[in-house]
Amino acid sequence: MLENVRGLLDAVFDDYRNKIERQLTKLGYVPGWQLLNASDFGVSQLRPRVVFVGIRKDLAAGFSWPEPIRNDPPTVGELLHDLMAANGWPGSERWREQANAIAPTLVGGSKKHGGPDLGPTRAKRAWAALGVDGTGLWDDAPPRHFVGLPRLTPRMTARIQGFPDSWQFSGRKTAAYRQIGNAFPPPVAAAVGRQIFAALAVKRIFKVA
């Protein structure tokens, strides 16, 4: 299984995809590409991603792409309110009401600007509409006396990406955010992984029977 940005399905990459498909077919695999939206799998983020799965030919009939879940993901305000309020910031309730949509796509951290930010100008405008200052990250939640637009912390971005709060990231703020922003959202990876496991399990059950 491989994951990449949605642009991989553009016509300019047809030859690249076709080459991969031909090579894997020769090796006895059935290749397939699918555009999956993270928000269809409970992730509070606008994050379309292309997923590639290559299944061995004798197992391919047992594989199908995961179906979207029925429930809408929580808004950014619903998802992050407890983290925003962790230091007693009185503006957290009003902020939760403003952050009433899912997040724009998280990026992997900007080396050009010397540190983590939440994306280009258009993305920063989308974050501002949600009550978030997208020009950088904080190490901690806003303090009690804070006035203005708060920034996210790495832990907040990890939750937006679908990581459990117990997940640990290596390094300081910038390094941690780059790991988070470049990651494949775990709920989507898990959904695809379960389908791959199901295809493998069919063969195993058949052998046992």
Region locations from a protein language model:
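Class I S-adenosyl-L-methionine
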Residues: 1-129, 206
